[in-house]
């Protein structure tokens, strides 16, 4: 695995952690809050964003306008049964969700969730590091690399891992600050 491949693989793990962070409520309306919602549509689970236009007319409201009005009830049900705690308002054409301000308890729950997502990202990075170091050790064992070259490569891999872990920690602290901001 080249250094570039290692960086690409690790940056994908960081991006996945960032996508997870984006699905956490912060007290302001955000369309990415609904990214994980799937709707039962003609017998198949379909992502909400494939069935409707999702907008934020103001900082406390999310508006969902289905492409097919027949899916309105299914979308409303999927939102109501999700773990987001939203109550959808259906006016026959558009579903509106009022995003209430977060309680202190809910903010703490979301901070824990963000920490969990960050830890998942770090574990993924460590797994990538382990695989890369195992390849380097195998190359050394096969005689393709000297002991010094192997140690240098392992140090480079560790430095890259540390940099990406710092990146996740930075994103986590930004998200926690955003969640805790009243």
From Swiss-Prot:
- Which parts of the sequence are annotated with region: Disordered? 136-160
The terms describing its cellular component in GO are: cytoplasm
Query: GO MF terms on file?
Result: ribosomal large subunit binding
Keywords tagged on the record: Cytoplasm, Protein biosynthesis
Biological process (GO), any one: translational termination
- Top-rank taxon: Bacteria
Q: Tell where it localizes.
A: Cytoplasm
Pfam families, alphabetized: RRF
Which InterPro entries does the annotation name?
A: Ribosome_recyc_fac, Ribosome_recyc_fac_dom, RRF_sf
- KW Transit peptide (keyword) present: no
Family matches, as CDD domains? RRF
Instruction: Give the protein's function.
Output: Responsible for the release of ribosomes from messenger RNA at the termination of protein biosynthesis. May increase the efficiency of translation by recycling ribosomes from one round of translation to another.
Cross-referenced HAMAP family, in alphabetical order? Answer: RRF (MF_00040)
* Protein name in UniProt: Ribosome-recycling factor
């Amino acid at each position: 695995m080249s250094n570039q491949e290692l960086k690409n693989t690790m940056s994908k793990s960081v991006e996945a952690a960032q996508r997870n962070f984006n699905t956490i409520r912060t007290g302001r309306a955000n369309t990415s809050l609904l990214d994980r919602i799937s709707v039962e549509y003609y017998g198949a689970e379909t992502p909400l964003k494939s069935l409707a236009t999702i907008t934020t007319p103001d900082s406390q409201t999310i508006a969902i306008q289905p492409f097919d009005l027949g899916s309105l009830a299914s979308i409303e049900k999927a939102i109501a049964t999700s773990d987001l705690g939203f109550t959808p308002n259906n006016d026959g054409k558009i579903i509106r969700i009022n995003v209430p301000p977060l309680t202190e308890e809910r903010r703490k729950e979301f901070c824990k969730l963000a920490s969990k997502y960050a830890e998942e990202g770090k574990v993924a990075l460590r797994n990538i590091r382990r695989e890369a170091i195992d390849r380097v050790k195998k190359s050394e064992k096969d005689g393709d690399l000297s002991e010094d070259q192997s140690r240098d490569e392992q140090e480079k891999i560790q430095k890259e891992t540390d940099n990406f872990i710092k990146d996740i920690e930075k994103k986590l602290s930004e998200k926690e600050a955003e969640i805790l901001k009243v």
